[in-house]
Swiss-Prot record:
One example GO MF annotation: 4 iron, 4 sulfur cluster binding
Domain Flavodoxin-like: 83-241
Name of the gene encoding the protein in the UniProt record: tyw1
UniProt-recorded name of the protein: S-adenosyl-L-methionine-dependent tRNA 4-demethylwyosine synthase TYW1
Domain of life per record: Eukaryota
Catalytic function, reaction form: N(1)-methylguanosine(37) in tRNA(Phe) + pyruvate + S-adenosyl-L-methionine = 4-demethylwyosine(37) in tRNA(Phe) + 5'-deoxyadenosine + L-methionine + CO2 + H2O
UniProt organism field: Xenopus laevis (African clawed frog)
């Protein structure tokens, strides 16, 4: 009983203690639970933060890996493997352009291959360009009658046939990317840049893709888009390089290929065009810009959304205010552009009013290398090799033999470097410009003559103290007595030619003017000269076209009319015949008929001079007749001309003179000129305003025996000493 009571008391005591202190116990429990909850919350938060950091690090690593992967793929992706530059050149211009372009492309880090079309077989190789990822550039010139240069003939022939051969298929060159730059002269209007246009068209017909519009370089400085063919090429080259940079970056907006004529016109503005906006702004002054505003167009499958254009024409009400704002902004920009356009049109009109200079930097460089001293913007003077020869007492030119000029006192010049022909035998290297009328800036005749004499005298002064130069002839050479207007070009094209001639005669300088028989009206209006030449390079229409390569479509009628105009002249007139073996030596009867038209006082017959190998001409030494052949031709021609005889010979120049019998006075030839008498007659003509006329027989002089045909000297002046060169290289230039 006591034990159970004690146990109960013990339990009761403790329970009562707990009951009495229950508030303390609750507080401790609450504090403990709070501490546990707080610690658990803190631990959970830290764990979450750690997981977030880990996940973020993993995400960054994943993104970095993805970025590296994309970069690696991009680096491995090749958009342009290289550039192949094809050139077809006759005179070397397009070849030179090809090398210039290659240098610029190399700077972009791309491999470049220069390909002469003559050495390339398109049948075996061209199809490879459809998968090569190369850009093929074609620089090709247009030659005579719209034909390609000899080096590009086979390539063009194959390409034309392939584009029209169903066996190749219309997608034969699909995937090939190309650009074309054509070289031509707009003076030849019917054939201007024909070859470049055809190559572009034929490639397009075979589904090749243009990377930019076809461009055209113009040798005619008057109509050239940028003033010269060199400037045209430079402008195109800048555009091409910008286009190439865009292609390198992976742009996929080539020309759609739907522009059949090679003149791409974008309907929508692509992102690549921003690369070229600066160049296009610079060229808004050009008269051709309206036909070639863009260098390429967007592909046909491009979506409107790519250019920021909505797919629907509807506008939400919420966007109406923004739309109105954009419309006002567009109107302001349009008004601003309109004013700018008017200003540019005014500047363009002003530019059109100001003619361009004939001499371009490239022409200046070429002629200077050939020994020309250029005057102003269209004239030049050069020291003839016969002038140098006679200063040394080594003999004069054929004019000295035939007409008695003093070769060391003869100035060879021209007031017009331009010509209306591109003769195959021209020894001026075909560097001079061509044209059918005067459209360049014009210098005054007083300035031209003053500068011509000054430059001629300066060139003579360079011979002071040179071994072999005769002192008396050196002093005489400083005083110009004769002027050969036969240097280069067509002097009669110069609008102030009559004024120039009067200035010459006022200074007692005789005038020997040469024309190419393409300007009959100018011949009729020409004032008297000491001697007027007409080049008669062929006697039939076909051979004249082949040899002279004239610009005029009616060249033959102009030729005939020029000869008829020559017959009306009262002063000394000369036919100049240049014999080219296998070209024009078998046309004796036709030559005789031409003599009957012009009734010249004299006929000079000269064998063509071989000027060395030239890309502009296919003449060789085989085309140069021997002197004996020239003599035989002259004798056979005289047999058909009852009023003419062979008068003089200059063996050194491979030249013969046929003279009208009226110059054989009292049995003696009088082909020489009394220069003092001519000056008296021309002064009287001028003072009388043309009423006191005179004829060729009024200023003749006796021809010395050594100058006559059949003499022992064969036209070499015995007062001089014949000089034989040790080597065969010689200067072939001369009047």
């Amino acid at each position: 009983m006591d034990k159970s009571t004690d146990a109960w008391d013990f339990a009761y005591t403790h329970l009562m203690f707990l009951w009495l202190n229950r508030f303390y116990i609750y507080s401790c429990a609450a504090i403990g639970i709070t501490v546990w909850v707080c610690s658990h919350f803190i631990m959970a938060r830290k764990k979450h933060q750690n997981e977030t950091v880990c996940n973020g690090s993993l995400l960054l690593k994943t993104k970095a890996l993805k970025s590296d992967s994309l970069t690696s793929n991009k680096e491995q992706k090749v958009y342009v493997a290289g550039v192949k530059i094809f050139y077809g050149s006759q005179t070397g211009t397009s070849k030179g352009f090809a090398h210039l372009l290659a240098e610029e492309v190399t700077l972009l880090g791309l491999p470049v291959e220069l390909i002469n079309m003559k050495e390339y077989d398109p049948d075996d190789n061209l199809v490879e360009e459809t998968t090569s990822k190369n850009i093929c550039v074609f620089l090709v010139a247009t030659y005579t009658d719209g034909k390609p240069p000899e080096s590009a003939e086979w390539f063009c022939k194959w390409l034309e046939e392939a584009s029209n051969d169903f066996r190749f298929g219309k997608t034969y060159l699909k995937g090939m990317r190309y650009a074309v730059f054509g070289l031509g002269n707009s003076v030849y209007s019917t054939h201007y840049n024909t070859v470049g246009k055809n190559i572009d068209k034929w490639l397009w017909m075979l589904s090749a893709n243009r990377v930019m519009t076809r461009a055209e370089g113009d040798c005619n400085v008057v109509k050239s888009k940028h003033g010269s063919i060199e400037s045209d090429f430079e402008a195109w080259k800048r555009k091409f390089l910008n286009r190439l940079k865009a292609l390198l970056s992976g742009e996929k907006k080539p020309c759609s290929g739907k522009c059949k004529k090679g003149k791409c016109k974008s309907k929508k503005k692509s992102s690549i065009e921003s690369v070229e906006e600066e160049e296009e702004e610079e060229e808004k002054h050009s008269e051709h810009e309206d036909t070639e505003d863009d260098t390429f167009e967007t592909s046909s499958d491009s979506e409107p959304e790519e250019h920021g254009e909505p797919g629907s024409g509807l506008i939400d009400v919420e966007d109406l205010g923004k739309a109105m704002s954009n419309m006002k902004k567009s109107k302001r920009e349009h008004d601003s552009n309109t004013e700018l356009g008017k200003s540019l049109q005014g500047d363009e009109a002003k530019e059109k009013e100001e003619p361009r200079e004939m001499i371009t930097p490239a022409l200046q460089e070429a002629l200077t290398k050939q020994g020309y001293r250029l005057i102003g913007s269209h004239s030049g003077v050069k020291l003839c090799r016969w002038t140098k020869s006679m200063l040394r007492g080594r003999g004069g030119c054929y004019k000295h033999t035939f007409y008695g000029i003093e070769s060391h006192r003869c100035m060879e010049t021209t007031p017009s470097l331009a010509c209306a022909n591109k003769c195959v035998f021209c020894w001026r290297h075909h560097t001079n410009p061509v044209g059918t009328e005067w459209r360049w800036k014009m210098d005054q005749p007083e300035m031209i003559l003053e500068e011509a004499i000054l430059n001629h005298q300066n060139m003579i002064k360079q011979f002071k103290g040179v071994p072999g130069v005769k002192p008396e002839r050196f002093e005489e050479g400083l005083a110009v007595k004769h002027c050969a207007l036969s240097l280069v070009g067509e002097p009669i094209m110069y609008p102030e030619i009559n004024t120039f001639l009067r200035l010459l005669h006022n200074q007692h300088i005789s005038s020997f003017l040469v024309t190419n028989a393409q300007f009959p009206e100018e011949i009729r209006s020409l004032e008297p000269v000491t001697q007027l030449y007409v080049s008669v390079d062929a006697s039939t229409k076909d051979s004249l076209k082949k040899i002279d390569r004239p610009l005029f479509k009616d060249f033959w009628q102009r030729f005939i009319d020029s000869l008829k105009a020559l017959a009306e002249k009262q002063q000394r007139t000369v036919y100049r015949l240049t014999l080219v073996k296998a070209w024009n030596v078998d046309e004796l009867k036709a030559y005789a008929d031409l003599v009957a038209l012009g009734l010249p006082d004299f006929i000079e017959v000269k064998g063509v001079t071989y000027c060395g190998e030239s890309s502009a001409s296919n003449l060789t030494m085989a085309n140069v007749p021997w002197h004996e052949e020239v003599i035989r031709f002259v004798e056979e021609l005289v047999d058909l001309l009852p009023d003419y005889e062979v008068a003089c010979e200059h063996e050194h120049s491979n030249c013969m003179l046929i003279a009208h019998k009226k110059f054989k006075i009292n049995g003696e030839w009088c082909t020489w000129i009394d220069y003092e008498r001519f000056q008296e007659l021309i002064q009287a003509f001028g003072e009388s305003k043309g009423s006191r006329t005179f004829t060729a027989l009024d200023y003749v002089a006796k021809t010395p025996e050594w100058a006559l045909f059949g003499s022992r000297e064969r036209g070499f002046d015995p007062l001089d000493k014949r000089f034989q060169r040790k080597n065969k290289t010689k200067d072939i230039s001369g009047c």
